Amino acid sequence: ILDRLIILRETEGLKINFIIQVDTLCHRLPNFIEKAARAGVKRVFIGLENINPDNLLGAKKQQNKITEYRKMLLAWKKARVLTYCGYILGFPNDTPEAILHDIRVIQKELPVDLLEFFYLTPLPGSEDHRKLHEAGSWMDSDMNKYDLNHAVAGHPRMTIEEWKKVYHDAWETYYTDEHIETILRRAIATGVSPGKALFLITWFKGCIGIEGIHPLEGGFLRMKVRRTRRSGLRLESPLIFYPKYLIETLRKQMRWIDLYLDLRSIYRKVKRDPSRKDYMDLAITPVTDEEVETMELFKSDVAQAFVTKIRRAEKVRHGEPA
């Protein structure tokens, strides 16, 4: 498929651009990332899920290896493709402090462009849902909330209110002005379009802060239809609905404009920096074998145990004594 798309772009001159979703080991496929970029991939969604090996094992994400995250993300950077990653909050070992700590580690050590957060959700029909049902655990009866954007089950180490709060804190922690500047600097230094990064950051930050919804469920203008209501809710009078909708829309658009202008000032600051193309930080530093000893990503006991396990497996794979 990629070969044919490359021909259409490079020989036929068709301007094909698209987004793909990949796993965290896609960089191990020979030439896959390079071909994807040539075929027209401009953005890639990666299910990062978590940086805690125990959480990944609990989510049955054995293919997600924290030792491969930087290699994979830097490979997409080299191909000048913008990355956005999904990150799940609410694994059994999670606490508000641990979640925010891990997000700061990601900011510092992983070259992720956009990060979007989801609640760990026992989707109806899944093994997790069945286990909770058989155990008699509380789960929200409103099926409309099972969209990964609501807390719908209990958590062993957080109350529902704490879980909700850290969900919103996670967005605010990642999308600070300081880190947005870092994202834009990394984009310029690695050949990714800073303008596209700014557009997406504005969208993500505004949907959460202004609309109060997940970015995948919204945009820059919220459309509401008076007669489209959830079952059981009465229709509002046109004399109430339309004036309220107009005022709400105008207020929100002013907030969108303010947000864009604030972020645009960060963008201009970065673009005016004469040394912008020479920017370097820990996250976009080339991978070395020694980093597992120095990076905070690998410093927890769980991470160290995982690194030891991976090293032992590599030795066995190469016929060396473990």
Region roles according to the model:
Residues 211-322:
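C-terminal non-catalytic accessory extensions
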Residues 5-196, 274-322:
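A structural motif corresponding to the C-terminal lobe/cap of the Radical SAM core domain
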Residues 182-231:
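Non-catalytic, C-terminal membrane-associated alpha-helical segments of glycosyltransferases
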